[in-house]
């Protein structure tokens, strides 16, 4: 290997291959654009985004890390969501979960 050299695989790299994806249509009912990052708990996004929130619980956008999807006012987009992995704990964001996503009988949602 030469210093600075890199080698790429010949086959494409597919992220989240083993995860089941959920497709949802999202409409921005607000008057300002809304941008959602790759690892944001989609259930907790801006309340002006209209979609099936229960179907989005425990999931994030299936896009490359560090990227985002922008929803312009009045626009409808189809997005693909995949479940969080690892310990499946969500903290902060819009304070709707703040803890484990599974196993508390309420789906993790705070009242």
From Swiss-Prot:
One of its GO terms (biological process) is urea catabolic process. Pathway: Nitrogen metabolism; urea degradation; CO(2) and NH(3) from urea (urease route): step 1/1. It comes from the Bacteria. It is found in: Cytoplasm. The keyword Cytoplasm applies. Keywords: Cytoplasm, Hydrolase. GO terms for molecular function: urease activity. GO terms for cellular component: urease complex. Its EC number is 3.5.1.5. It catalyses: urea + 2 H2O + H(+) = hydrogencarbonate + 2 NH4(+). InterPro entries: Urease_beta-like, Urease_betasu_sf, Urease_subunit. It is an enzyme of class 3 (hydrolase). Belongs to the urease beta subunit family. Heterotrimer of UreA (gamma), UreB (beta) and UreC (alpha) subunits. Three heterotrimers associate to form the active enzyme. PANTHER family: UREASE. This is Urease subunit beta. It comes from Geobacillus kaustophilus (strain HTA426). The lineage of its organism: Bacteria, Bacillati, Bacillota, Bacilli, Bacillales.
């Amino acid at each position: 290997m030469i210093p600075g050299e890199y080698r790429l695989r010949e086959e494409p790299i597919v992220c989240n291959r083993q995860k089941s994806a959920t497709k949802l249509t999202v409409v921005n009912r607000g008057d300002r654009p809304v941008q959602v990052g790759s690892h944001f708990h989609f259930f907790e996004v801006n309340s002006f985004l209209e979609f099936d929130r229960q179907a989005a619980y425990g999931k994030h956008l299936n896009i490359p890390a560090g990227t985002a999807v922008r929803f312009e006012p009045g626009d409808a987009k189809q997005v693909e969501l995949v479940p969080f992995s690892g310990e499946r704990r969500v903290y902060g964001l819009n304070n709707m979960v703040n803890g484990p996503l599974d196993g508390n009988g309420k789906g993790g949602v705070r009242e």
